[in-house]
Structure formats: C-alpha cells, structure tokens
Amino acid sequence: MQQGDYNSYYHHQYSQFQNPTPNPNPNPNPSPPAPATVAGPTDLTRNTYASAPPFTGGYGSADYSNYSQNYTPYGQNSEHVPPSAPSFTSPSQPPPSPPATSLNPNSYSTFNQPPPPPTIHPQPLSSYGSFDSTAPYQQPTSQHMYYSPYDQHQTSGYSSAPPPSSAPAPNPNPAPYSSSLYSAPPYSSGGSSIPPSYEKPSVKFDQSGYDGYNRSRSDLGSDLYGKRSDSGEYPAFEDSYGDGVYAYQGGKVEPYGSRGTAPKSSNSTLFDDYGRSISFSSSGRDSSVSSNSAKIVRAVPKADVQEDSTGGVQKFRVKLLAETYGQTTTDVLCQIGLDGLRMLDPSTSRTLRIYPLENITRCEKLDSSILAFWSKTPVDIEAKRIRLQSNSYTTNTLLDTVTAAMFQAKEIGGSSRPPTSGKLIEQTAEKKKGLGDWMNIIKPVNEEKDHWVPDEAVSKCTSCGSDFGAFIRRHHCRNCGDVFCDKCTQGRIALTAEDNAPQVRVCDRCMAEVSQRLSNAKETTGRNVSLQSHEDLARKLQEEMERNRKSSSGLREGSGRRMKEVACPTCTVHLQVQVPVSGSETIECGVCQNPFLVSAH
C-alpha cells in the first residue's frame, strides 16, 4: 500500500457497497423523517460494529441533522477533497448494514483524521463518504481544526461543534507514537443524556499506511515485531515481517555455546572454561563439604604448651639404643625444649631420663638414621654417648632442633654476644688438648669399654663367621664393641675429631660409619662457628616453636572437634590432628608431607 492511498482498504472491505456514480445533486437540506426509537443496550450490542460508529440500525437521520445544519452545504467540486471531510448529508436511501466480517481484533478506529498532506490524489466522493463521520470538518481558509465530541455508545448523536474562538490550536509536532493519545474515554451508561466526549489531540499521518483508517503504530500495541502482545492478541499484518523474525530480548539471551548454564538464582551452578563446576551456594555446610573433599588437611607436629619460661617443646618417637652391656633398646618419646632433652615413656609420659642442654657437649649424626649426643654431669669424668635411632628425616630434624636449642639456651643463660669465633676455637682446642692429654695419662692400657661384648660370649667372628681358636684371635671393635677376627678389624681410625685422638681398631662396618661421622662433625663445627648461623638456628627454633604453639592452640580453641595425638607412620613425628566424627579422614603430615588415614576410633 503506497503513501496517500486512503481508499484502498475501504475498497477492499466494502467494494460491494461502493457507488461508482455518486449523486451529482445531493440534497443539502433533507426533510427530517420521523424520529426513530432509540435502540436499547441489546440493540446496540447487536447492531454496532467497530469501524462505523455513527451508522447503526437504531439511528435515523434526525440524530445528526442538527449537526449538519451548523455548516454550509458541501457539494461536489473538482478540487482536491480530502477523503476525511464528510458531507454530513444523509443518503437517499438507508445505508445497508455492513458485513459481519470482523476486522483485525487489535485494530481501533482512531475517529480523528488529521489534515492530510497537501499533495493528495483526488477520488470520487462515495455515497458512504460520511463513513468517517468522526473526522473534523475543515474550512478551506481556516487554520484551526475542530473536533466534535464522540459518544462511544451513540446515545444522543452528535453535538454541535465548539465555536472557533474556543478551539485550541493543535500541536504542529505531536509525538507520533505516544501511547497516551489513546487513553480510555470516560464511560457513561447507555441512557445518559449528556454524551461523554472522546477527544483526542491531532496526530501525524502514519507514514507506514497500514490501512484506510490511517492507524498509528501505537494501535498495534507495544510489540512491533509480530510477537503476541501482553493482552494475548496479535497485531495486524504480523506476516509482513516474514518467518523467523523475532523480537530482540537482550536481557534474556544466553552466551553462545552456554545454553542452559546461565544462572537462574543465587544457588545455581556455573562452569569454567574447562567444564568444571563452580558453585556459588550460600550454604556454609555445602561449601565446607566441598572444601574438605577437595583439600587434604595438613597436620602440624604436636607441641605441648607450658606456662613456664621454657616455651614450646617438640616430641619425637625414637629408639634409645643400648650403650652398655645389659641394656636393651627401648622406644621412647624424645622431648626437645629449652630445658633439655627428656626421654619419656610413650604410654605414661613419665620422664625416664633428662639431659639438660648445658650438659650436652656435642651432637652429631652417626649415619642417616642414628643421632648421637654426648652429655656429662659434674661428677662424670668423660661425657657419655646417647644414641637415638629413627628415620633420616626425623634424624635431621632432631639434629637441627637440638643444635638450635643449645645455642638459644646459651644466649638466654649467658651473654647475648658470644666471643669471636677465632678466640672460641682456640679456647676450645686448648681445653680439648689438655683434657685429651690427661685422659691418655690416666686411661688404663687394657681398658675394656662398657659396651664391649665379653669374649666368652662369642665363639665365631661376627662378620665372617670364622671359629676362634689358637690361631684366630678375638678382637673387639672400639666403636661398636662386637668381637671380630683379625682380618675383619684391619681398620684404624680416631673415634673423635680431636687432634690428639688415638687411632684405634675398628671393624670394617664401623670404619665407614666413623669416617662419615667425622666428616659430618667437621661440617657441623664449621657451620656452628659462624655467629650468623647461631642466630639463624636460634631464630628458627623459636619461630618453629611459636608457630606450632599457635597452631595447636588455634585448633583447640577454634574447633569443637576432639583432638588426638597421632604419630606419623613415615617420620614418626607426633602430630596433633582432629578426630573425624565418623569414618576416617586423610591427614597430611606437616613434616614429611606424606598422607595417612586417621579413623574416628
């Protein structure tokens, strides 16, 4: 439909009622017929239709004869006449009732035809030219338009037009698509004598030209994309957009490739780039369960907190090796603190032995699994050796902890600034030299060690198994005390790192052990003579104990779960863990980082 074609829709709908030869001499002043009976509400319902309000079966020409007398007769002429200017004359015969064909259910008659554009094609005036009866009559020279009140129920016909002086000037540029132009009119009952007015301001022509009534776009509803409107009705010409055209809904569109993954609520599940679920659940229980299943709890070494100045201590499960004949190897808990090394009974925690830090002369590793330290009392002439056996990691940890504890105890008890390393080495060497000379003087020639195995207890060589006899003599290893033959005790080595230490007979096994021990002792001595190393070790011990004490207290205070002391099966370090409520839980050792299971029972 082209712009300016104002009659095509009319021809399409009412072509059977179109009169191609209109009356050339219409009667400007028809005689009023007998007054017709006003139709009741039932008649109005049956006879009215949406497109032609003024022509119903219950109304005669007298209903609007007064309206037409207010204007001069308007006849046919050759000028361009807008199709919306009615003649307000009654036809020579009653108009036939229009067909019962229902127009578009969403279409409304605008009942106000604004002035058409100046360039318009002429058309013959139909006998039904007064069909658009609600359009205002426009004087050729007038600049104002008058709008007659329209009663939607057609109770009293048309009222007289307002005087020109009271008509407001229309807005030359109204909003063409304003939804407020079609607000509901005041409703009145069918028997009211005062007709309610349905006044509308002027609007521009619909540039799209949907139909013969020049409806604006707002008649089609708020949905301009052919979708169903909120009221459930479909606008006209919904097939004019073609198939597959839908309204854009930006807020409801999901990202490409993620259909079904858009969040519907705060408890929904999202997915990352690798397809793993990302939960934003507000439930604290769910988050705690997921975190526990995804992460293994790390247990820290157990540290007993004491109220005195000794600070925190650490316990290690080790084996106390026998040093003399008659002793047995026992399992103990080695507790290292600033007060010394305590050997505790694992079952009763009773103190079996105590070695104060000030009495410990040195500490070194005999091999990867044995730690030895020497301790003496004021009544002892020579320091006694104590050997502790464990795995390699625990042995290294024990060595570092004992060394740091010794230097920290000296710094706390003595002066905070120890003597220089050169003087310390000289004084230590002099003392060791004098003590060694004195020990060599007073030591008997045939001295037997306490840990030596008696000769009568062994009849064969411990290493090669040769039977002892007149030609195969028994020899004791000065390090381990076992009995060997001469061929298995060819090694000679000093058992200590002292300068005047004598070379003694050792077995082949102890030869390698003592050599490794002496090399470790030299490295430890070179590391300990540095002042910075002393401070680092002391600081390390203090920080480690403080951290363990805080973590242990935090676990006790922050959690209502029962705590339990568990020994790591790998490094034998005692750990303080939370006992699970039921079943078992995987715990990671804070020392060796190896996982193990802790059961609820």
Swiss-Prot record:
What PROSITE patterns is this protein classified in? ZF_FYVE
Listed Pro residues bias regions:
21-35, 161-175
For bias kind Polar residues, which ranges apply? 63-79, 125-155
Q: What is the effect of changing residue 32 to A?
A: Loss of interactions with VPS23A and VPS23B
**Positions with biased composition (Low complexity):** 176-197
Cellular component, GO annotation: ESCRT I complex; late endosome membrane; multivesicular body; nucleus
Which stretches of sequence are listed as region Nuclear export signal?
Answer: 338-344
Changing residue 83 to A has the effect of: Loss of interactions with VPS23A and VPS23B
Gene Ontology BP term (one): protein transport
Free-text function comment from the UniProt entry: Endosomal sorting complex required for transport (ESCRT) component regulating multivesicular body (MVB) protein sorting and plant growth. Required for the formation of intra-luminal vesicles (ILVs)in MVBs. Binds to phosphatidylinositol-3-phosphate (PI3P) and ubiquitin. Controls IRT1 recycling to the plasma membrane and impacts the polar delivery of this transporter to the outer plasma membrane domain. Regulates ubiquitin-dependent membrane protein degradation, vacuolar transport, autophagy, and vacuole biogenesis.
**Domain remark text:** The FYVE domain is required for PI3P binding. The N-terminal domain (31-86) is required for the interaction with VPS23A and B. The C-terminal domain (515-601) is required for the binding to ubiquitin. The C-terminal coiled-coil region is required for the interaction with SH3P2.
**Extra remark beyond the main annotation:** Reduction-of-function FREE1 alleles exhibit enhanced sensitivity to abscisic acid-mediated inhibition of seedling establishment. Seedlings overexpressing FREE1 exhibit increased sensitivity to salt stress.
Which protein is depicted?
A: Protein FREE1
